[in-house]
Amino acid sequence: MLRLDKFKKYSLTFGVTPIEHLPRLTAALGGKVQIYAKRDDCNSGLAMGGNKLRKLEYIVPDAIESNADTLVSIGGVQSNHTRMVAATAAKIGMKCVVVQESWVPHEDAVYDRVGNILMTRLMGADSRIVEDGFDIGIRKSWENAIQSVKDAGGKPYGIPAGASVHKFGGLGYVGFAEEVRAQEAEMGIKFDYIIVCVVTGSTQGGMIVGFAADGRADRVIGIDASGTPEQTRAQVRQIVDNTAELVELGRKVRDDEIVILNDYAYPAYGVPSAETNEAIRLAARTEAMITDPVYEGKSMQGMIDLVKKGYFPEGSKVLYAHLGGAPAINGYSYTYRNG
């Protein structure tokens, strides 16, 4: 049994997220593989929710105990994570500073005024746009923001990009795996594969540890959307090792149990390909399930392609982890102006 119970948790979500069968998407892909989705995009009333809240539930107690008064984080201009940090700060009564780096070469005229960044500002966060490019690692701009809060007499609590390399960043998605096991028992089925987008790494990393408990670590198929696969894999490896130790998995996760596919991140982080756009439209038109051009659109593209290529044996049950992120589609309004 994984020792997730020894960590404090601050509730930010509605609880267990639903799993639904996607019959029309299943049929559109030939019907030989059954597609399901776990709807972490519907997990909370905090500013449209999303996967980062699972992570933040285990980070907030540490922030409160540190006597911080300001959460400080970082992401791109259309960052789901900074939206969720801003929402969390508003909910728990802290101030919030978020650095929003220019991770995406955007062309839409309203990219920096709608969607995630609009909601981040609406919730009172101090949103600071910085011209630095994409990188999933620890950033100087974030460290500068933390120092600026100190210089102003505040007490900052730093949360890195995606909450991923935070010591507790992987715990929430260990909990995801435990939820899935309980839901499988209720539904009378068992999923053969889990599809998840990976960039900063703690969502997949936590899942890998969680599913390692029942021998399914290598069935967690990460679809890279970073375009920096070596860096992403190294970060996932680090998160897996740290999280496995925290929850007392009792063994080291092997390298071959960390499965990340690098075929779908093109042409660049945050830039959808024609195939990404086709996947977004197919999910929307078959299941009214909205995915975004940065993350979920690419993992949806990956899953669709894998089904078509026969990656999953006939009769497989595939669980698509919908992590949220739909607000970002507003930053791509020209691309989707006609649907």
Curated annotation (Swiss-Prot):
EC primary class: hydrolase
Domain of life: Bacteria
A single BP term in Gene Ontology: 1-aminocyclopropane-1-carboxylate metabolic process
Modified residues (N6-(pyridoxal phosphate)lysine): 52
Pfam families: PALP (PF00291)
The UniProt record lists the keyword Hydrolase: yes
Catalytic residues as annotated in Swiss-Prot or TrEMBL: 79 (nucleophile)
Gene3D superfamilies recorded: 3.40.50.1100
One MF annotation (Gene Ontology) recorded for this entry: pyridoxal phosphate binding
Cofactor requirement: pyridoxal 5'-phosphate
Keywords (A to Z) from UniProt: Hydrolase, Pyridoxal phosphate
EC number per UniProt: 3.5.99.7
InterPro entries tied to this protein: ACCD_DCysDesulf, ACP_carboxylate_deaminase, ACP_carboxylate_deaminase_bac, TrpB-like_PALP, TrpB-like_PALP_sf
Catalytic activity: 1-aminocyclopropane-1-carboxylate + H2O = 2-oxobutanoate + NH4(+)
Family annotation (NCBIfam families): ACC_deam
Function: Catalyzes a cyclopropane ring-opening reaction, the irreversible conversion of 1-aminocyclopropane-1-carboxylate (ACC) to ammonia and alpha-ketobutyrate. Allows growth on ACC as a nitrogen source.
Assembly notes: Homotrimer.
Entry similarity comment: Belongs to the ACC deaminase/D-cysteine desulfhydrase family.
Annotated protein name in UniProt: 1-aminocyclopropane-1-carboxylate deaminase
Gene that encodes it: acdS
